Amino acid sequence: VKRAEILEATRVCVCGEREQDYGTPENNFATIGYFWGVYLNAAHPEYTKAFPYNGITAKDVAAMMALLKVARIATGSSADSFVDLAGYAACAGEIVTAENGGTA
């Protein structure tokens, strides 16, 4: 698979079907971060000060999902994992740009 094909598959996925299914990355990742925080506080109360329930941001979720993909790539990769990795990076970049008032 060529770079351009991976990036095109990422664009189709991230800018089309994923957003239609799950909403914007900012909103979806913020919800995931909230639930992860609630879970971590319930499962590991000793971490409450370090990770308050609202302390995992949409940007954090994008970064951690990218790390999940890197871990999968390390143990056996398929082109799909690289498509997903590029998608999480693109979403993180968009989230950071929005947080910075539209500048990267």
Where are these regions (language model features)?
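Intrinsically disordered, low-complexity regulatory regions
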Residues: V1-A104
